[in-house]
Every structure is written in structure tokens, then in C-alpha cells.
Amino acid sequence: GELEYQMSQPTVEEGWLHALTIPRELFIQNGKLHQRPVKEFERIRRHERVIEAEGYTFIDQETWSVELLAEQLSSQKISFNFGNVLKIYFDNNNLLIQRKHWNMKGYDEVQVEISELENIQVFLDQSTAEIFVNNGEKVFTFKAFFTDEKGIEIESEQTIL
């Protein structure tokens, strides 16, 4: 049941269970509620890399404390794979996010329709993923337990930044 599911999370052994999300600012844009990370997060960025990706791109990572900001997407077919734990796909106005389940085979997934994908901002740490789509029009928070595979794979039909 639910108790067994909650207690199966890897962080239970470390003495904690639930997630504390990053601070965010709420605002109204075009009559819709949006969310974005607070500006103060920009001040704590370290080791910033700007990468232009086209076709298949692999980004090697030393840690799972990551912020990825992809812009200039122009609604193309695109996918992001974070260590085979979190996968994000966009194609034909469909955004699909898959998160590897920590104690069963397979992935949990959420799917939403969006008219276009302009940008995506992803924050990761050892056990949490936060995804901001189109300047916070859609926002997702997941428990995601990353393993030793620390690479990010990006596949796109056009150049993204």
C-alpha cells in the first residue's frame, strides 16, 4: 500500500522522505498563473557552460546538481535524457516526461499538450527534478533518484542553445 511505497524511497535510509522545492515567484501572464525560480538562483550558478546542440549531443556531468536551460527551441522535435532516470520528449505539440521508478521496473509518466515549446529549464539534485516549461507556463516537480550515470543526452532536429 501507500506506506510501503513511501518507505521504499532511497532517502528513507538517510532519515528523510519528502521534497522541499526550490523557491519560486508566482505571476500572472496572459490571464494564466505562471511560476519561475526566484532570481537569486542566478547568483549561485557555478561552472556555467553554453552548449549549442544539434542532432545527438552528450554532456558529461560530474554531479547531479544541475540546472539546464534550453532556449530557441522553435517547437522542434527534441528529447532530453538525464542519466536514464528522467526523460523529456517534445513532438507534435505533445510534452512527455518520464521518471524512472525507484523500486519497480519501468517509468512513471505525465503527458501534456502545449501549442509550442519555446524554452525549458530543468533543476536537478540527487533526489529531485523541477521542470519549468515556457517561462513557467507549465511546471513539474518529481522525486527522481539519480544513479552513477551522470550524462545528459540531447537529441534535436535543429540547433538549440
Task: Label each PLM-derived region with a short phrase.
Residues 1-161:
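Beta-rich accessory regions
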